[in-house]
Curated annotation (Swiss-Prot):
Enzyme class of the recorded protein, top EC level: transferase
Originating gene: hldE
Catalytic activity entry: D-glycero-beta-D-manno-heptose 7-phosphate + ATP = D-glycero-beta-D-manno-heptose 1,7-bisphosphate + ADP + H(+); D-glycero-beta-D-manno-heptose 1-phosphate + ATP + H(+) = ADP-D-glycero-beta-D-manno-heptose + diphosphate
Name by which UniProt lists this protein: Bifunctional protein HldE
Organism: Actinobacillus pleuropneumoniae serotype 5b (strain L20)
Enzyme Commission number(s) from the entry: 2.7.1.167, 2.7.7.70
Keyword tags: ATP-binding, Carbohydrate metabolism, Kinase, Multifunctional enzyme, Nucleotide-binding, Nucleotidyltransferase, Transferase
GO molecular function: ATP binding; heptose 7-phosphate kinase activity; heptose-1-phosphate adenylyltransferase activity; phosphotransferase activity, alcohol group as acceptor
Active site: 264
CDD domains, per the entry: RfaE_like (cd01172)
């Protein structure tokens, strides 16, 4: 099978739609309120994430693709929080800030990895500033390879038909994740991406794949679409186009923790691939792989190029293996939110031997996920001498990543991983050898965060130095 690339060097995407701020309050629930039969949540952590059309833009930016966001927000704290989030991800924020309406905000309260309550703060933007949005679209559309119209029914896309016509006139593909049953308003769009429930709400119940194809092709003809992608949860997705065979893709999700924002990820990757000049089949393949990654995360999330590449190559799990430091931080954050215990260790691991394998297996048994931080080649030379390492960094990390006991491998350039450990803050820090816990780099940071530090024994007679001596003696 052809291997597709997650690098989109020629893509540039414009997103226009209902912009929201997603707030998450995480906390422990250990008692019932004396005031009413409801749990008391002691809030321990607060997160703010871009939602709606803003999450679509975040998904595109996470793929290192230029993206601009148009929409409506309020002149309030939520709007300022969104602006800060978007700027931190290099998203061109062209949203109109109004003093007459609040930013649409959704607050979710979670405990023990379960959502207890959602609070919506919104008035919508019906009959507000549609002329301004349309004028800005006309000015900028020709600079982009694709337009996403993100419709959550909040009023930003009241002029959606005129927006579609502006894009058609400019020759720019328009992709829409539809809302409601009035698909007439999307007439002339390039591609719609309804989920199965949304699709059946318009065409009626479909008893099998043949009926999905039949009714989907009729919908394409009725509303003058170029294509239709029906996302079907555990059954994957189906791409339909006139006079072409249907293209079915099975789901790639291994574990599903949260489907929040999965539709945003699908349309983001689709539009990015199409803007990059990829065929529809390839765009759908990439979008399907990305969806399989994002549903394994908690809350509104994005997918990185590394995660997408892992999924494309059918690696056993996405978001694992060799990661850059920023990618590891995101992966660890998601794992902690799922309640997983993170174990971390470090070393040169120059020539992997049975002692290493046994040590890493024992470390992994102490938690749910194991991080191995590896000295770079320059760091090894400073510690071990100019003749080391025998194997370069890429080779050492590749071997470690292939072990079943290892979830993440990350390089560090310093002599010790103290800074990295302080950034990651594992639940358990492990080191092999004759150390005292307080002598281990990073131990103070882990203890200060409420974590543990343990020393594990290496197998007697197993060392890289002994392996090198045996090799030299055999020559």
């Amino acid at each position: 099978m052809m291997q597709y690339s997650p690098k989109f060097n020629n893509a540039k995407v414009l997103v226009l739609g209902d912009v929201m701020l997603d707030r998450y309050w995480f906390g422990a629930t250990n008692r019932i309120s004396p005031e009413a039969p409801v749990p008391v949540v002691k809030v321990q952590d607060i997160e703010e994430r871009a939602g709606g059309a803003a999450n679509v833009a975040m998904n595109i930016a996470s793929l290192s693709v230029p993206v601009a966001l148009h929409g409506l927000i309020g002149q309030d704290d939520a709007g300022r929080a969104l602006d800060k989030l978007l700027n931190s991800h290099n998203i061109q924020n062209h949203c109109v800030a109004l003093d007459s309406h609040p930013t649409i905000t959704k607050l979710r309260i979670l405990s023990r990895h379960q959502q207890l309550l959602r609070l919506d703060f919104e008035e919508g933007f019906h009959h507000v500033a549609s002329d301004s949005l349309l004028a800005k679209l006309e000015q900028e559309i020709t600079a982009y390879g694709a337009l996403i119209l993100s419709d959550y029914g909040k009023g930003t896309l009241e002029s959606v038909q005129q927006m579609i016509q502006v894009a058609r006139k400019a020759g720019v593909p328009t992709l829409i994740d539809p809302k409601g049953t009035d698909f007439e308003r999307y007439r002339g769009a390039t591609l719609l991406t309804p989920n199965m429930s949304e699709f059946e709400a318009v065409v009626g119940h479909c008893k099998d794949d043949d009926e999905i194809v039949e009714k989907g092709l009729k919908l394409i003809a009725d509303f003058e679409l170029t294509a239709l992608l029906v996302t079907r949860s555990e059954k994957g997705m189906t791409l339909l186009r006139p006079n072409q065979a249907p293209f079915h893709l099975p789901t790639q999700a291994k574990e599903v923790y949260d489907v929040t924002g999965a539709g945003d990820t699908v349309i983001s990757v689709l539009a990015t691939a199409i803007a990059d000049g990829r065929p529809y089949e390839e765009a759908c393949y990439l979008a399907n792989a990305a969806a399989g990654v994002v549903v394994g995360k908690l809350g509104t999330s994005t997918v990185t190029p590394t995660e997408l590449e892992n999924a494309i190559h059918h690696r056993e799990e996405t978001g694992f293996g060799i990661l850059a430091e920023d990618e590891l931080k995101r992966a660890v954050e998601q794992a902690k939110q799922r309640g997983e215990k993170i174990v971390m260790t470090n070393g040169c691991f120059d020539i992997l031997h049975p002692g290493h394998v046994s040590y890493l297996e024992n470390a992994r048994k102490l938690g749910d996920r194991l991080i191995v931080a590896v000295n770079t080649d320059e760091s090894v030379k400073r510690l071990k001498g100019e003749s080391r390492p025998i194997n370069d960094l890429n080779a050492r990390m590749a071997v470690l990543a292939g072990l079943a006991s290892v979830d993440w491998v990350v390089p560090f350039a310093e002599d010790t991983p103290q800074r990295l450990i302080g950034e990651i803050l594992p639940n358990l820090l492990v080191k092999g050898g004759d150390y005292k816990p307080e002598e281990i780099a990073g131990s103070q940071e882990v203890w200060a965060n409420g974590g543990e530090v343990k020393v594990l024994n290496f197998e007697n007679g197993c060392s890289t130095t002994n392996v090198i001596k045996k090799i030299q003696a055999s020559k």
